[in-house]
Amino acid sequence: MTKDLLLELGLEELPAYVVTPSEKQLGQKMVKFLEDHRLSFETVQIFSTPRRLAVRVKGLADQQTDLTEDFKGPSKKIALDAEGNFSKAAQGFVRGKGLSVDDIEFREVKGEEYVYVTKHETGKSAIDVLASVTEVLTELTFPVNMHWANNSFEYIRPVHTLVVLLDDQALELDFLDIHSGRISRGHRFLGSDTEISSASSYEDDLRQQFVIADAKERQQMIVNQIHAIEEKKNISVEIDEDLLNEVLNLVEYPTAFLGSFDEKYLDVPEEVLVTSMKNHQRYFVVRDRDGKLLPNFISVRNGNAEHIENVIKGNEKVLVARLEDGEFFWQEDQKLNIADLVEKLKQVTFHEKIGSLYEHMDRVKVISQYLAEKADLSDEEKLAVLRAASIYKFDLLTGMVDEFDELQGIMGEKYALLAGEQPAVAAAIREHYMPTSADGELPETRVGAILALADKFDTLLSFFSVGLIPSGSNDPYALRRATQGIVRILEAFGWDIPLDELVTNLYGLSFASLDYANQKEVMAFISARIEKMIGSKVPKDIREAVLESDTYIVSLILEASQALVQKSKDAQYKVSVESLSRAFNLAEKVTHSVLVDSSLFENNQEKALYQAILSLELTEDMHDNLDKLFALSPIINDFFDNTMVMTDDEKMKQNRLAILNSLVAKARTVAAFNLLNTK
């Protein structure tokens, strides 16, 4: 016989960004609890609103499954003393399992007998097991926690109710300072406290109190309501997924509505209006069927349609205040002078240990010129890079960016164009922030890409130079994101500039006092970002092998990983990798540089391998390079079969190691083959 279990935790309003991850966590913790306690079930369903997290288990067994376990103990010769009695070791072993020596039997394992005991455990009733089910709540983790009242414990928000039902039976449990029951809270304004009659009636009981407990149902309600308004008003609404998920977790009973604002605000840049609506007010942006921005918005009320006209007016009033600010800053900022703003950046701190934003820009100017040369930009592009690098942070001192910091770079482009700057310069000011996330948009122009690289390189090197290096998940200056941007831009634009050369030369340009160890740390940090870019679907040994190669060009490292993944499916992969790996391992024994002396060759295999190495021409085509290296496998194996590398003759040994070292030097441009797993 099976039953349904309901567990609901009622809290004060959760931050929207916490709700969905916490809901998923709760479901996962419940599944683990049931599996660990041998309680079978059919399905687990999760629920969440801003004021509750809940999980329902359907088809829960009324009793644990019985458990039978075999335990292996000491060998028979240790378990029995000279008189054939059980030793203290045997007695201690069975005592630890809650059994006696009468339960011992001997079983043969690989020719020797060992003590074995079999323990049978009868399953407990589900109710007995569920006495500890609040463990799943204790084990939830949150980004931040808080104290409340005089309690010593911490949790994401104060807890008010706990409902635990097995079918219609309320289980009496405690969590923190809350005793469980069947009372849940309805909508803060439209509902009231209500009894949940049974686990199966959970959604219906709450629906009567204006709470839609199922997040997916709530989301679909919002989408359907928006589509209905679209159809009725012949408009088009941008349903941004991130915004939808946020709004979803701000309401328990959603009602979407259409609001409006004065058309005069459409003269303000669209980005300002969209940011005001979307980022600040959590409104959905409205356009006509051709994509033109309209003086309207859609918002979602946490409640029903009663007195909705008052809600609309209130939302319109709040938005207009934002738009008034935007309009004011748009007009006032145009009176400012770019040169004056750049000069004022001398007084703005980039970081107290690093200097001002002006100094940061000065370094970026030098770095960007170097990068523009390496990337073979045209003279016109180089001039644009130089100009952009000289002014690109000026918009940080405008009123608009001070109020709407999401618009940095975007407003810089607009103000630069109004001031008569070249379009390439203006675009670079916007693009230098790209990408803003791990998979965000990249710069479209070469000028913008160079400025973005220079800015990110200086940021990375500056913070490393003063010891502000990310550790664990802590990365307050977003250096991982900046570095991810560096490798993505280099790869996307096909700029095959070796990273080790870049780091060394950029340190020389702007950070001459920094030592080699510091540069090694930077390279390791960049390698970690490249590994992330390669992706976890590529086996770990292949990722490590290409990152330990002597190639520091992003595109070639990525190509090498793909080539190895492809080759790993071939029948010859194991043999080829093992022959190269053997060469790598022996080459590590080279203690000093020795040139190959062909007069010391004793057999044809030495000569054949050395000639093959001399003839080996590797290119930037990693697939072709692997083909060429793997083709050497028979020659390498023939060499090893007929040649004693580590001979007692020191000259001969060093000469043979030199042959292998010359092979490894070429092969390492693809990968460190000795790190590849062929098991």
Curated annotation (Swiss-Prot):
The keyword Cytoplasm applies. It is an enzyme of class 6 (ligase). It is found in: Cytoplasm. The keyword Ligase applies. Its EC number is 6.1.1.14. Tetramer of two alpha and two beta subunits. This is Glycine--tRNA ligase beta subunit. It comes from Streptococcus agalactiae serotype V (strain ATCC BAA-611 / 2603 V/R).
